[in-house]
Amino acid sequence: MNKIRLVVASLLLGAATGFAQKPFNASGTGNPIIPGYFADPTVKKFGDTYYMYATTDGSGAGFGPAQVWTSKDFVNWTLMPMNWPDSHWIWAPDVMKHTDGNYYYFIVSCMIHCGVSETPRGPWKNILGESEAVLVPDRFVTNAITLDGQTFVDDDGSVYLYWGTWGIYKGFGCGAGKLASDMKSFTETRLIPNTEATDFFEAPFVMKRKGIYYFMYSSGSCHDHTYRVQYATSDKPMGPYTYRGCILETNADGTIHGPGHHSVLKEGNEYYMVYHRHDNPHSNRGFHRQLCVDRMEFAEDGSIKSLIPTHDGIGALASSVVKSKNLALGAKVRASSFYDAGFRPEYAVDDNNGTLWRPRGMGQEWIEVDLGVAQQIQTIWTQFEYGTQFYQYLIETSVDGKHWSVFADKRNNRLAGSPMVDFGKVKARYVRLTFTGGQKNGFGGAVWNLKIFDGVEASAPQQWLGLTAADWNGREWQNNEGMLGGAFTLKEVRHAHSVSVDAMRWYWNRELHWSIVIRYSPRPKSIQLVGWFTGQVNGRVMKRGRVFHQERLRCIVPPNLWSLPISVTTIGNRKQRKRHTMRKRISCVCL
């Protein structure tokens, strides 16, 4: 990369536009989009929800569980686990919706697997049957190394798949194929050589605009500043393509470093490029990447203008789902320690997903927020450094900074997520978060953002999911569409007409058994399930026949919904159960 050329370009841009770039550590920057280390993003909008599929980064080798981030406004994102694949070697995922109504999930670990589901979050099953069955083995197309699979759906509904890495060698390039209607085979394949896609290294992405097919890809090394996005065009999805140039590269001051492996979101007439870049300060070897987004522009002839990467991002694409004020934003803060000047305590309250408070030690480090005056607090979001790992912590509040009360005790937590959401209702001036342990040794309690709200702010909207008796016959998974995501396992219990719905293993906790177990006989005609946290029967809590463990129930918002922090079951004699079952309908909802 020619640094002089970058500086000159930056100066010319500033002179021409008067644009002042916000520094990477400014409060409230829009980039990165998500708090955490993720790479190789694919962004899609299905219905009114945005989905971000990405490689889990930060481990040194792109190692992490299957997951997806969801958002209604493109600003507030919630991490949701997915059921497949079981391996943690999951790179460059992509999901598309087919004309058959199903969703197809393409994931890579030096070969491409394909899952199918009725929803964009799964539950997924390998389209070829066996969980480890491979759709595209390595070198399926000669001289195309299999990695980074991405789909493109043409106007006529035809589906194409593109893949490749290390395409810089002579005679190498990108593999491309047109999928058959069953999505299990190809009707046509081709190598798009690096003589057409100059400098092609990896991460192909194809889109169509006004009759032009754009073949975009990444060049250089993903470990350093040379990583960039280039493109070529054609009048056919399989090419041949004509090289057009570079459209995204490292900025002049290096704070947007190694941008690449992108996807494109079309929203109305606007196009947005979502890409990863290295963290700030830069970690060793570029394995701590973060996701960003910037607006694309096109010239009259259809060529893509050079994209100027920013720390501002694009902001919200819909009305914000968060209605309450973040009391912690810009508040005074102090901590037990901080690693160095690049990881100050103030970074935990700046609403910036690219700045991090990191304590010096690995023990019970703490951070304390001073709101100035006592205020009502109902919700606290904590966005820890690694959203796919669980953290154990204690949140306390105080009016005077001397006498403390417990707001949330998660010292036995086994649930991963981002944000971690804790509810309560207290008036306090001080909030203290203490890290007490975590999933992996050597990972301290670093925090991207600590957000304190005066209202009730769930990180995802309440959603209902109908489940009839027929749905669980022969079925193993049912998604949790509520705030905490994940999936339920469905299984028959010992009694022939009973049904058990158990939460997945990541909801287990030493202190509480986070699950819903419903046993009715005979089997109910229908049951509505969304989550594992609250329940109601016919719009009210069932209090007759000792249906639930009453001593374990507590009321939460909204009214008439009750938390079920342990397994619940029907209790009483057989006649009571039978009479009860015939006239009642069970509902569970996650807030």
Regions found by a protein language model. Name each.
Residues S263-L265:
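Catalytic nucleophile loop of clan PA
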Residues M1-Q21:
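Bacterial Sec-dependent N-terminal signal peptides
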Residues F38-D40, I90-A92, T146-G149, F201-P204, ...:
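Conserved positions at the start
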Residues D350-Q462, R494-L591:
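Aromatic, loop-rich ligand-recognition surfaces of beta-strand-rich domains
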Residues K170-D182, A318-D351, P461-H497:
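Predominantly extracellular/luminal regions of secreted and cell-surface proteins
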Residues Q21-T198, K208-G254, N269-E270, H276-S320, ...:
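Beta-rich carbohydrate-recognition and catalytic domains
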Residues A197-T198, H311-G330, G363, W508, ...:
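Surface beta-strand/loop "capping" patches
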